[in-house]
Curated annotation (Swiss-Prot):
The keyword Zinc does not apply. It comes from Homo sapiens (Human). One of its GO terms (cellular component) is mitotic spindle. The active site is at C291 (phosphocysteine intermediate). Pfam families: Y_phosphatase (PF00102). PROSITE patterns: TYR_PHOSPHATASE_1, TYR_PHOSPHATASE_2, TYR_PHOSPHATASE_PTP. This is Tyrosine-protein phosphatase non-receptor type 7. The modification Phosphothreonine is found at T66. Its main location: cytoplasm. The lineage of its organism: Eukaryota, Metazoa, Chordata, Craniata, Vertebrata.
Amino acid sequence: MVQAHGGRSRAQPLTLSLGAAMTQPPPEKTPAKKHVRLQERRGSNVALMLDVRSLGAVEPICSVNTPREVTLHFLRTAGHPLTRWALQRQPPSPKQLEEEFLKIPSNFVSPEDLDIPGHASKDRYKTILPNPQSRVCLGRAQSQEDGDYINANYIRGYDGKEKVYIATQGPMPNTVSDFWEMVWQEEVSLIVMLTQLREGKEKCVHYWPTEEETYGPFQIRIQDMKECPEYTVRQLTIQYQEERRSVKHILFSAWPDHQTPESAGPLLRLVAEVEESPETAAHPGPIVVHCSAGIGRTGCFIATRIGCQQLKARGEVDILGIVCQLRLDRGGMIQTAEQYQFLHHTLALYAGQLPEEPSP
């Protein structure tokens, strides 16, 4: 309990001799002052005293988790490991997977949390923003006064390894040179594109050349092209000043927006193409993955590759844990329950392709 006691002004100090103090009668008790909030005492000379005798009656203060803290705790700790056997023979039902998916916090970023002037002009979707703690910052090789912003995040890979991927949106007309600057800056040697240019409306601009083109200070050339049933592979070179590098570009177009492919086989073949690419093993830079918004199909591809690596190395996969890790790095990764179910189906198919293991 906080008690208030009257006090004299500092301009009139109290002086009282010892004798006078002993002969004067005790002062009359004055009624207790009305409780006043601390905010209302600003500028006052009223002294504050804490009555420690009352502390035992005060309930202990309990820490209350904010929604943000709850979100982060869930994403950091949730998991549902499935053995190869369980994934193939006792998988969760579609209803169970939908319920599990809907419990995962999206971890989207609000515009108020992204204090970067002018970023809206470089966002394809105003509600899909890069999480600040993992966003890619451009070093501005172009010497422009556009700041360091690009709608892209570093994404962890298998076993939590840092910066294995960069998840980003499909380039816009005013961000194509930013995209190539990111590719150069991060020493990217592999780009995986998971959208068509138009799906009813524009999903991504044609950011690579037919033969040769210059984007900002970067010159891009097509060296070779290979058509596969489900995807197209292009070998590019990117040149900045006198230095030239090779980049492999894979366009996987058999995946409708907000939906899933007709079968899991093509996606697994795409993962195998990436896994077997010399660019994957020989270069330390991250793999750039994008669709249109950079969260749905992008998240599915990255989660599929991580899940395949878990199954191969451990004999089990934690799909819930994978999605939570992805959403910590970029909000909204894996957009729909249908995509979450398809991810389980795809990894069950992959588990069946691995060498046989004994039943539990």
